[in-house]
Amino acid sequence: MAAFFLGESEMREHSSDLFMMTLNPFREQTTTTNAHDDHFYNLCFGSQQYRPRDEVGHIEQGNSSISTFSNGGVFRALAPIYLKAAQELLNEIVNVGNGSHGAKQERPVSKESTIYGVEDINGGYKPGVAALQMKKAKLISMGEMVEQRYKQYHDQMQTIISSFEQAAGLGSANSYTHMALQTISKQFRAVKDMISLQIKQINKLLGQKEFDEQLKKLGKMAHHHSNAWRPQRGLPEKAVSVLRSWLFEHFLHPYPRDLDKVMLAKQTGLTKSQVSNWFINARVRMWKPLVEELYSEEMDIEESRKGSDRYSTKGSSSKQPYNNTTSNESSNTILPAFRQGFTETETPRQNSSSSCSVVMRFTKQHMNQANFINFNGGFENYHTMDGNSVSLSLGLPHSCDQTFNNIHFESTSHGTENSAIYSSSTYQIMD
C-alpha cells in the first residue's frame, strides 16, 4: 500500500484500486482524521503519524525511491511494476517533470489527428509524396472496412428483425429497431465523411482534383464500356449462340416450327417474333451462302474427276495405234461422203431410197476395213429423234430408220469408242 502526494492530487493505491483526491494547498491540514483514515495511514506508514504537506518531500524523477518524510524515512513502492506507468501518466497529465504543478496544459495535437491541407498549406510541415500516398491508401482501406462493418451490422439487425417478426408478426419490430438503425447509420456516416474529408485534403496536397473525379477518370481509363443509356444493338451473344447452334443442327431444313420457336424463346429469353426474324435473316445471310459454296465445291470436284477420266482415256487410246490410224482414215473418208449425202438431201427429200442408198454405200465401203469404226466422239452427241422429223446428224428423214431397225450404236464405258454393228441377215440393200 502506498500514498503519493503530488501537487494537487493524492493517489492512493488500496489493493488494486486507485483513488484520486483533489487537495487545497492553502488550507491547513487537520491532524484529526476519522478512524478509517487512521487505519489506512497506519497500514501505509507503520508507526508514523499523518503530517502536514510541508513535511512531504519530493519525487526524485528517474529513481525508483520516493522521499516521503523529512526525518529520512525512505519508502519504496511495493509495486514497482506500475510505478513507471503511473509516472508517465502523471507527466502526461500534469507535467510533473517540468516542475509545473499549476493548471493543466492543453495536450498537443498529434500529427495523425490533423487534417492535411489546412495547416500544411499555410506554410507548415509538408510531408513527402510517398507518405501522403501511403496515408491515402490506408484511408481508402479504412473506408472500405467501415462499409463492410456497416453491412455486417445491418445484416445482423435484419436477422433480429426477421426472427422477431416470426414470433410477433410482420411489422412488429419496426418500432423497436427504427431508432437503432438510424443511430448506426448516423455514426457510420460520420466516420465515412471524416475519412472522405481526409482523402480530399491529401488530394489537394498532391495537386490532384477531387476524389470522385479521379475515380471517374480511372474508371474510364480502365474500362472502355459504352454508356448505360445507349441501347444495345442486336441480340445478346448467348442468345445468338443458341440460335446458331440450332441452325447448324438442322442445316438441311432450317425452318423451325412454332414449338421450336417457343422453346428457343424460353432458352434465349427472347420473344417468338424475335426468334422468327433472326431465322429469316440467318437463312439469307448465313445459310444460303453456305449452300452455294458447298454446291460450287461439289461442281469443282466433279469437273476435276471428269478431267482425270479424260486424261486416263487419252493414255489408253495412245496404246492402240491401229485403232487411231483407222479412225483417222475413216474420218477422212466420212466427211466427203457426209457432204455428198447432205448435198443429195438438199434436193427434195421425197425419194428417201436414194438417201438411204448413199448411207449404205458408205457403210459397204468401210465394212471390210474393220469390224467397228471409232469416230473419236464425232457423232457421240447426236441422238435419234422420234417421229418423221429430220435428223441433224446426217440430214435424213426418220422414215428410213425403219429399214435400219437393227443398227445399234453402242458407246463404251468411257465414251470414247462408238461401234456400229450391222446384221446383214435382217435388212436388204436398196439400189
Curated annotation (Swiss-Prot):
Residues 302-333 are annotated as: Disordered. Residues 80-96 are annotated as: SR/KY domain. This is BEL1-like homeodomain protein 5. PROSITE patterns: HOMEOBOX_1 (PS00027), HOMEOBOX_2 (PS50071). Residues 128-199 are annotated as: BELL domain. InterPro entries: HD, Homeobox_CS, Homeodomain-like_sf, KN_HD, POX_dom, TALE_homeobox. GO terms for cellular component: nucleus.
